[in-house]
Amino acid sequence: MSGKIQHKAVVPAPSRIPLTLSEIEDLRRKGFNQTEIAELYGVTRQAVSWHKKTYGGRLTTRQIVQQNWPWDTRKPHDKSKAFQRLRDHGEYMRVGSFRTMSEDKKKRLLSWWKMLRDDDLVLEFDPSIEPYEGMAGGGFRYVPRGIEDDDLLIRVNEHTNLTAEGELLWSWPDDIEELLSEP
């Protein structure tokens, strides 16, 4: 090597169209999801989400459920079936029907509701709960329903932040008996 410094040619990044809230909303109405919008604009899905939150865009059902999530859960907790079913329950309550769910997701949610009802249980979160068989990621356990649980599917404890909308999201659907009696 001669000792001379080699300079690499710097190729400017291709310019991209600025992402705006109106463009995001327009594409959502046309059926694009956030991942597809991100790919179109060369940004991350999180950037699309950030634009929507920052500039007052319409939130997706999942985002509303996340906004009202009753606990400060971390990455390993989302591996838990209990976490996933409660998230599905929140989406059902927000939409008011199964129309946005696959048949498989609907079946799993109905089965979960039936287990909670038949065994008279609620879901409790405590970050100190270690993972155990059937509860990957830890943090969750099923506990017997108490009078203090009222109509909620969750146990309110020192780790719970229950918003007014969350109180509606994390309660039984009004027509739960009818839903569970469907074949």
UniProtKB/Swiss-Prot annotation:
Domain of life: Viruses
The protein's name: Repressor-like immunity protein
Keyword Repeat: no
Function statement: Confers immunity to L5 superinfection, required for maintenance of the lysogenic state. Binds to multiple asymmetric DNA sites. Regulates transcription initiation at an early lytic promoter, Pleft, but also affects downstream gene expression at 'stoperator' sites in the phage genome.
Protein source organism: Mycobacterium phage L5
Keywords: DNA-binding, Transcription, Transcription regulation
Result of changing residue 123 to P: Thermo-inducible phenotype
Effect of residue 124 to G: Thermo-inducible phenotype
Residue ranges: DNA binding: 34-53
Gene Ontology molecular function, alphabetical: DNA binding
Entry keyword annotation includes Ribonucleoprotein: no
Record's signal peptide: none
Disulfide bonding pattern of the chain: none
